[in-house]
Amino acid sequence: MFKPTYLARLQACCNKFELADLLQIKVTFLTNVLYRIRPENQYKKFTIKKKSGGEREIFAPDEKLKDIQQRLSELLYICQEEIWAKNNIKQNVSHGFEKNKTIITNAERHRDKNIVFNIDIENFFPSFNFGRVRGYFIANQNFKLHPNVATIIAQIACLDGSLPQGSPCSPVITNLICRILDFRLSKLAVTYGCSYSRYADDITFSTNKKNIPDALVSNEKENEPGKILVEEIHRAGFTLNHNKNRVSRCTSRQQVTGLTVNKKINVSREYIKNTRAMAHSLYFEGSYTLIEKDGKHRKGTLSELEGRFAFIDMLDKYNNVEAKKNARPERYVVKGFGLDFKQRLNSREKAYSKFLYYKNFYGNEQITILTEGKTDPVYLKCAIDSLFLDYPQLVREEKNTKNRVLKVNLFKTNDKKNIFSICLVELQTIRGFSDDMVYFVKRMKNSLLKIQ
């Protein structure tokens, strides 16, 4: 028996009862959230620092509204995949908020190019107002939803008349609506022998031509976009933030979504040096300082520093994989660092290793328990959880939720943070786990001296 697609089921919906059923929620729950409590009363606003300076407003929905938005997001992602499969569409230009796409895949399209041109859409999320969201789902040839259903979707997604940054369903809706922009700009790029990609509001063109076409850049020295490009941006319902226009040639540092792309995908040397300096300060002074774009200093956290190390490590892994499959591996290899990582860590991995050692075995606020087997932490957690009344020093129970929280850290021996490659900072050979544990204990004193 033929089973209708999720897109067909969405198109068949005519009212809130049928949409609620498709989202697998009770219609009374949907009605209460949308029309009694109302979405504008269900957000918490906070700000985060922008890399370019200033602040970005984030609106986080409460649990009830977030649940509905997550369900809508998943439904629209499935519909998008069904549309792509039906029309044989290969999505390779939009990299923000897309599954299996990252800032790395976005930057890869512009690696080793003669000229890179970056532009930025101004007020990206506020550009998607209520009428635009509703109208898209009614008029778009792939959706053609009932007006009542399109209205409800816009009510779920919008705050104060536009899509808020922080909602689970804002990313997929922006990408759906931006598809026409991507199509037009991709066509423009191909016409003039360029590559194109978009990561949310960051748009990048690149070319190996001697000069970038006038249709894209009318004045390279002034970073002024071409008339045809500006017209296409306006035609799609957007405006440009001209303060972020940037033309970069291969003789200077070329960056795409914060990554350098001159020869290989990487972070800047300053980023790596600053990360190591922060770690050094943490080891010997007990804390480190982050400098905001506005010049203000604040104390950094372990999580923030771990994020920086993990990001550097992720790029190393990407370049190592590319080195193996590329015909010219020297373009990807980080010079000066050994790649025989089965037996030896390179300098970046050693720095990451040292930090993780500090975090788990020196600067840890809770006792860390090392186990032999991969499943041992699971068994220990279950045992401690079931005997929490007898061992209050190992577990506590939250008053409101009755959830039990461990007071110890069960070290997981999997993936990148395992006992083999991280804690044993200068591991020379691959041995059994028991031998590694003995080796780890023997080296503990020496390892501690490095961070004291």
State the predicted function of each range.
Residues 119-121, 209, 373, 382:
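Residues immediately flanking
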